Design a protein with these regions (language model features):
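N-terminal positive-inside, membrane-proximal cytosolic segments immediately preceding the first
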Residues: 1-19
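Short solvent-exposed coil/turn linkers within tandem alpha-helical repeat scaffolds
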Residues: 74-83, 97, 111-120, 148-157, ...
Length: 225
């Protein structure tokens, strides 16, 4: 049986085509890697200025300029690996400037794009702070309640979130709920860093604070005869 082999030119053209595709793939990967490094470096540079801008000695002009840089960087590179962290820091700068709606918008970006649970939790709590600063206690309460539902006693920010929730409940006039939250906090954290403050709030609200359990005595060593 006669087999028709491809002409040598066809084989050469096909080989060149495969080589070209491979070269494009390698070049594309190299370009992507280079671009990601460039974007990462840009974020790192601006974020360094953002941290410095939040120092007490930083001027309002500095904070405004850095906030604008963060805003522009996020708009140019919204899918950058550090976009969520940058949005969170932008929110902090806007919050410090008492621009609460703008801060809330930045925090919402951090929540939407954050791969880190810590960044998302911080941003979600900060949304509650913006509502509280605007004296919209009902929305602040909703925000803190949503965060508290997703956290357990072993989670980062659990203690602070319950304190925020109880404070919002007080401000919203829901005294019984605030008492329950404070008591829950003391139950989960008998040795909480702010236990005295929490007990003080319970006394102010006319509720008894849970009595801390006495420390358990260490087991005595067996007597050898």
């Amino acid at each position: 049986m006669n087999v028709a082999w491809p002409a040598p030119r066809t084989l050469v053209v096909a080989g060149l085509g495969l080589a070209l595709v491979a070269a494009i793939a390698v070049g594309g990967w190299y370009w992507y890697d280079t671009e990601q490094r460039r974007v990462g470096a840009a974020y790192a540079e601006v974020m360094t200025r953002a941290y410095a801008a939040q120092a007490p000695q930083a001027t309002s002009d500095t904070r405004t300029r850095v906030a604008r840089e963060l805003e522009e960087l996020i708009a140019r590179h919204p899918s950058g690996a550090s976009a969520a962290e940058a949005a969170y820091e932008l929110g902090n700068l806007r919050y410090a400037a008492q621009q609460y709606p703008a801060a809330r918008g930045a925090y919402e970006i951090a929540v939407a794009r954050g791969a880190s649970p810590t960044v998302r939790t911080l941003a979600r709590s900060s949304i509650g702070y913006t509502w509280e600063a605007e004296r919209n206690f009902a929305k602040a309460l909703d925000a803190f309640q949503a965060v508290a539902k997703d956290l357990g006693p072993k989670d980062f920010l659990y203690e602070q979130t319950l304190l925020d929730l109880a404070r919002a409940q007080e401000l919203a006039g829901r005294t019984a709920d605030a008492v329950a939250t404070y008591q829950r906090l003391l139950k989960d954290f008998p040795a909480a860093r702010r236990a005295d403050e929490i007990r003080g709030r319970l006394v102010t609200l006319g509720a008894p604070a849970p009595v801390p359990a006495p420390p358990t005595a260490p087991a005595s060593a067996p007597v050898r005869r």
